Each structure stands twice: as C-alpha cells, then as structure tokens.
C-alpha cells in the first residue's frame, strides 16, 4: 500500500478537488463535489493504488480521439458526497496538501460542510459559494499561476 504522504504529494501535483455548479430545470443551481486525478493510461496502476488507500471511487477510461497525438487517459473519480465526507476529506485533513492544492482543498471542505447543512439548496447558499470563489481569486499567489484550481463550470 502507498505511503499516505506520497498520496498527498501526488495529489498536490496531479489531483483536483472540483466544485461544479450546474444550471438545471427552472433555473435552479446544482452543486457537486468531485475528487479527481487524470493520467495517461500507462499510469493506471498508481490510480488503482490511490483508490485502495482511499477505499472509494471509480476509475474510468477516456479516449481523446479528436486529438491525434493524445494517448488514452484514465481518470480516478470520487463523486459520492458520502465518500467525500467520510473518506476523502478525513484523509486529506490527516495528510493535508502543502502546495498548490492547499487552498483548493480548504474551499472544497467549506462547500462540503455547506452541502451537509443543505445550504447549497438556497439562493443565499449558492451566492455564498460564488463569493467563496471570488475570495479564492485573492489568494492566487499561494496557488499556481493564473488558475484558481477549482472547476467552476456553469453548465
């Protein structure tokens, strides 16, 4: 089994604590949390080992046929809020990210707590999640280059 500190270091470089807000019927917003790591297909073994350490999630194959020079990829993803709250967050609180994923993880935890309290189901809660995004922009220097490192897709 992989050393937990190795997993955290790997995630600091390759992982993503994603928060997405999608518009669904009747202009209601839906908030989702996902923990993801995407690698080239030949690195699938490391994703399987991380999956064992965390004890949750799925691994998917991705084909990028439209990009001729791209190789197939694999993605490890945890999308279950229960697994995120009971496995992913406790793991990374015990072995916290130290580099560019630190702020992303902190924000991820705040939004997970809001979801646990059902705040994401209210207009005020959605507005608070958007304002957290703006606050994160002010911490760019503690992150990486020009990217907030949080997926904020409005679908």
Regions found by a protein language model. Name each.
Residues 1-155:
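Sequence-level preference for short, compositionally simple segments enriched
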């Amino acid at each position: 089994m992989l050393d937990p500190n190795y997993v955290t270091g790997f995630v600091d470089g390759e992982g993503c604590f994603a928060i997405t807000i999608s518009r669904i019927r009747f202009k209601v917003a839906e908030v989702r949390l996902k923990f993801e790591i995407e690698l080239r297909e030949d690195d699938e073994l490391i994703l399987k080992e991380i999956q064992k350490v965390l004890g949750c999630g799925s691994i998917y194959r991705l084909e990028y046929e439209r990009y001729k020079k791209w190789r197939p990829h694999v993605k490890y993803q945890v999308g279950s809020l229960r697994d995120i709250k009971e496995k992913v967050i406790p793991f990374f609180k015990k072995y916290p990210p130290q580099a560019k994923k630190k702020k992303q993880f902190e924000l991820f935890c705040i939004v997970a707590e809001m979801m646990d309290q059902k705040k994401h189901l209210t207009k005020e809660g959605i507005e608070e999640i958007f304002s957290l995004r703006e606050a994160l922009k002010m911490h760019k220097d503690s992150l990486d280059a020009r990217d907030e490192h949080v997926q904020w897709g409005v679908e």
